[in-house]
Amino acid sequence: MKSIGICTRLFSALVLACSFAAEPVAAQGFPEQDGAAPTSVQAEQKQPEYSTSVESPLVVVDALVTDEDGNVLMGLKKGNFRVLDDGKPQIITDFATTDAPITIVILMEYSGIAYDYFAYKAASWGTEFLDHLEQQDWVALVTYDMKPTVRVDFTRSKPAVEQAMRSLSYPGFHEANMFDAIADTLDRLEQVKGKKSILLITTGVDTFSRTRLDEVFDKLKRSNVTIFCIGIAESEYLMADLRAGTSSIGYLQMKNQLQSFADLTGGFAWFPRFEGELPDMFRSVAGTLSNQYALSFSPTQESRDGKYHKLKVEVSGPDGLPLKVTDKKGKARKVVLYARQGYTAPMASATAND
């Protein structure tokens, strides 16, 4: 019972961390990079049965550079970076800090499994995440149990998220089909331009998804979406570690899955034990999205094979050696770089299907 109490307070804070002063706002549509309202998340997107050839496709890799303490390293230049495509160095054609509008989906588990983690108290932690986003950024809220439900379509008005949070009542289903929810969200984001991210707030439990785990990974490899995961059942993981049997293995597997989603896409995964850890986590998500470097390169003709390619981003100092940084006391600190681990290459040519 002690474990459940910890999780209850923790998930309560997570819910309210996305909430602040209520103001009814109608929110429709997914944003295009130019600021216009894009295709709605609520509409089914039918994919065309053909593809078009692209003369000079660009692969954009967002990279975050920090020290081992999580301090962001800014002021780096194009010459500090090297991008490897399947081990082969690429010419970085475009380089910039990422100041384009952010598009982020808050994808939150809302099932009978997680209901005990909710509470209805006023709190101000929403500012820890939403207030760090810029006015031009877009946020959507999607919850899931047996299936995903769009609570707030993409909006620039952050209070719409809080309004939707307050409307949540007792979940209608006990199931939590996480894989289906991730796959559905990725499908909806496919037609959205610009910088796209998912903030996944979940126990990590998947009950009866039709989508398999390997299919989720395949979709992630084909997308350019960064996933940030907050595993809300860490106290349960800790309790499982104290017990013998399959439960400990199951919890470890769920944690590893969330960590893998983040690692593959260049994001982070957190597993907070206490409520007090949450504000820093939400600030980290917002800070990451606003402090990345955008590195672009054009794949060679031979590389345009429609296959998955492994990416590696390296950062070096002016002398070409690994970048070295020190803290205020002059102590050497390790440099940590976050970037997606690969991309699916375009085809060199394409024709319409019959």
Question: What are the residue ranges of the model-derived segments?
Answer:
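Bacterial N-terminal signal peptides
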Residues: R9-E23
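Scaffold/interface architecture of coatomer-like assemblies
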Residues: A26-D354
